[in-house]
Amino acid sequence: MSAQNLLVEIGTEELPPKALRKLAEAFAANLTAELETLELAHQGVSWYASPRRLGLRVIALDAKQQDKEVEKRGPAIKAAFDADGNPTKAAMGWARGCGIEVKDAQTLETDKGAWLLHLAKVAGQETKTLMVDVINKALAKLPIPKPMRWGANKTQFIRPVHTVTILLGDELVTGEVLGKQVSNQLQGHRFHHPEKITINHADDIFDVLKSAYVIADYEQRKAQIRAQIEAAAKAINAVVAMDEDLLEEVTSLVEWPVTLTATFEEEFLAVPAEALIYTMKDDQKYFPLLDQNGKLLNKFLFVSNIESKDPSVVISGNEKVVRPRLADAQFFFESDKKKTLESRLESLDSVLFQKQLGTLKDKSARISELAGYIAQQLGADKELAQRAGLLSKTDLMTEMVMEFTDIQGVMGMHYARFDGEAEDVALAQNEQYMPRFAGDSLPTNLISCAVAIADKFDTLVGIFGIGQAPKGDKDPFALRRAAIGALRIMVEKELPLDILDLVAKSQTLFGDKLTNLNVSTDVFEFMLGRFRAWYQDEGIEVDVIQAVLARRPTKPVDFDRRVKAVSHFRTLDAAEALAAANKRVSNILAKNDITSEGNVDESLLTDDAEKVLAAQVAKFATELAPLYASGNYQEALSQLAGIRQSVDSFFDNVMVMADDEAVKQNRLALLSQLSGLFLGIADISVLQK
């Protein structure tokens, strides 16, 4: 069966840049699913996209479906014929529907009886006759939250559609898609090639579009922009801090990228670099430039969508556009410096954090107290932590942050320095929000850690305390991010803080505002759940995590040490046998209602195997105590692996459930002590092969 490459392109008005990749990928996935449903074989579906088009290419798509036989089961034999062997009305009606006589039907024999059967041959349809319906279905399933109508057309899509092209090899597939007749006409570049262009073969798509000033291949266009930016920066001995999200967005904004260099007045460099960078990147989609020491230069790169005969005009235009934005930032900065952060505390009372939990001023006071409490436990300066916590939300009341919300914290740091606050206090204004996302940096000092943890626990305890835990995908207060952020800080900075202790302290700071009496348990369970998700993302086996969760450690750094110890233990030769033995011990103790360790009476030890095991258990109990106390669980489990032979010998030679009740209870006490050695770290009985 012959196969041809398929081309599908939807030409539109400018598509939302941040949604472009998602739309194209979904379009490809939807078409792939539709082709699979129709059993049309091919060698792959790929997408391309630009601001004014969504395109798909299907390699070696079969020209038609395979012919196939379809089983059409009729009535049961018992119901198909009467007592005289004549076909019943049911049988004749079924046969008529199949286009046959009852006598021509076959019989299907099964365990449950026999039925009439007809094997109908169904001819496969030609691909070109199916494509319009397939494309319409694939487009209808795109993730478009707010589709729009245009003109007198009742069709809805993300943006108005101007062209639809479907080519199977060199053959045009006819029909209507999104209210437009399919044609072999494509849109070129809006300015460089405003006329429609004709394409005669699916394989020519990239060459045809390139002739019309469109680099259609998304990844090729992205790579070209990256190379242009790096070359332009290198040409002036500058460094570009490549922002992948910005690069992605710019790729979705242009069809014929041309990178140019522009400048702005040096006086603007007196404004904190973060504010200028935010303005250039987020507002204007420019790429800021740094010198070799990482200091912001008064130059930037931008990617134009036109290849101008006079680039200076384009450069001048962009410089004129950015200048007022930089001037605004300069004005806000100078204006904000006229008031100290401390003087803005009262204004926080006018901003609600959450209706039941009070204002941002209330939250700042709670953060201050909790940060001081945490700092004290860490041996850090309590007063500095309290001061940093008190000022932590004041920059939200500055003009700069009100205008550029994403630079909250970093502006607080700059203003705190200008106010003469201690450097640790200033740094904490920015680092309180760390980590902002997965893989982000953590606070750099203990004061910042204290404030960051305090802020996150205040939110967790407060929101759980009023019964608004996350449900499904809904997490309006970003509690999952707060929990994993606090855990990361405590684990990676090795801070010996206790979750339940912090929750209890935080609870007291809310007074009578909290209505959930189970807030402590709820927050703890939620954080254990975040631990599980974190470690699974890190590739830790689920049974290792469960082994540690069974012991419910309340200190994150302690939890982490146990997980690492059990992960290492799993690699030892003795691990599998000891896990099985512990499971056996656990079952024996459970059946005999043994819930605590008993004392072993040496005079009742009669078998050599139990004497050896008892001696080893006593020896390990003494020798491992310092390792448990210091959290050196990996070494403790490594040493415990040496008890395997004694455990195996015990179960091979000793009858635990002895007839003598005293001997039985003594042996149960020994097993309880053995179990306790491992349970001091984790429940290794849950480990699997």
Curated annotation (Swiss-Prot):
A GO molecular-function annotation: ATP binding
EC number(s) reported in the record: 6.1.1.14
GO biological process: arginyl-tRNA aminoacylation; glycyl-tRNA aminoacylation
Gene3D superfamilies assigned to the protein according to its UniProt record, in alphabetical order: Isoleucyl-tRNA Synthetase, Domain 1 (1.10.730.10)
A GO cellular component entry from the record: cytosol
Transmembrane segments: none
PROSITE patterns per record: AA_TRNA_LIGASE_II_GLYAB
Keyword Acyltransferase: no
Organism superkingdom: Bacteria
Cross-referenced InterPro entries: DALR_anticod-bd, Gly-tRNA-synth_bsu, Gly-tRNA-synth_heterodimer
Catalytic reaction(s) noted: tRNA(Gly) + glycine + ATP = glycyl-tRNA(Gly) + AMP + diphosphate
Keyword Lipoprotein (UniProt): no
PANTHER family assigned: GLYCINE--TRNA LIGASE, CHLOROPLASTIC_MITOCHONDRIAL 2 (PTHR30075:SF2), GLYCYL-TRNA SYNTHETASE (PTHR30075)
Family named by the database record: Belongs to the class-II aminoacyl-tRNA synthetase family.
Protein name: Glycine--tRNA ligase beta subunit
Lineage, top ranks: Bacteria, Pseudomonadati, Pseudomonadota, Gammaproteobacteria, Alteromonadales
